Amino acid sequence: MHSFRDNIRALPKPAWILFGGTFINRFGTFVIPFLILYLTRIGYSSAQAGLAVGAYGLGHLIASSAGGHLADRIGRRNTIVLSMFGSAASMLALSQARSYAPIVILTCITGALSELYRPASYALVGDLVGEEHRVTAFGIYRLAINLGFAAGPATAGFLADHSFTLLFIGDAATSIVYGFIALFALPHGLRTYVKTERTGEALRVAARDKPFILFLLATLCITTVDFQLGSTFALHVRAAGFPSRVYGLLVSTNGMLIVLFELGITQWTRRFHPRPMIALGYLLAGVGFALTGLAHTVPFLLATVVIWTLGEMVSSPVATAYAVQLAPEQYRGRYLGLVMMMWSLGMIIGPPAGTFAFEHNPAAVWFACGALGITSAALMMRRRS
């Protein structure tokens, strides 16, 4: 078993460049966490705002398939560059939209372009880092994400109380910065697509991979829960009488906890078989969100954030490394694209269904979160032939 210091030293320089660029991009994720609040402020209903967030999820779904294919075909770096510059342009266009149809269309396009990089980034980490160091590498990758996430929403919350336009400008600017970093400092990564490969071959291989299918189903369940953070959780905080900055600080608490504790937790979880750790994390996430319905004070809301964040810290680095482990090298980008597709479906299903239920029976949202958390844990622990 390698020590934590050994694992850190084993990571190559390009991996650290990827982590740094990811931090910059994640810090600038200003708009999507506040999209529900922005749209309701300019006059749209909660249901309409939830549908717009679902459109972002549809774009995410398109990006999951296209991003995985592009990562294997044109290289990891080129896919990241395309994603960053394209998303900056679409985000600036979205900032100027006021009619509902253009907002939904541009949100979908922004979702596709801004999420196109994810399969490529995960695949590039898998290319650069050997299996024995991947859990640590993905832990640091998530640390970069959550360092940005700790500072970004808190900054965005204060900006949003003055001008939502600043959120769009900041989001686009950080994407452009990461685009240039990727263009000049990242390696191409593997190109594993071959012209002789039959159409849909990677999908057929994945469909016969029972452990991978169980993992995909569990991922879909828990991501439907996770995406309540930017939709019904925001509405619940506002319904409890708190301003946007309180929601921003609660979201940033998630990132700060991960920054402080996840790498230490990762060094513990990597000692065990991945499936029980993923199941435990998914269960804690479901329970944490389920308790939100009972939380109407800031301390109680903070407690729920701590519980589901603990679940995220236990499961997420292990889950990503597990997906890379299951993926054959020649299909790595597309396997990870399928994982991202489950995240996309969770975003498509979660916010619209959650906001619709919230308007009619808020308690049903939090009960469903608990049930989905239990289901996802059970899928990960299911015996496989």
Q: What are these language model-derived features?
A:
Residues 1-12, 187-217:
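Juxtamembrane intracellular "pre-TM" segments in multi-pass secondary transporters
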Residues 8-57, 213-218, 222-250:
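Helix-loop boundary and gating motifs at the non-cytosolic
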Residues 30, 57-65, 149-150, 255-259, ...:
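Residue-level signature of mid-helix packing/kink "hotspots" within the transmembrane helices
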Residues 63-75, 261-274, 358:
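Helix-to-loop junctions at the C-terminal end of transmembrane segments
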Residues 127, 182-196, 382-385:
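Helix-loop junctions on the cytosolic side of multi-pass membrane transporters
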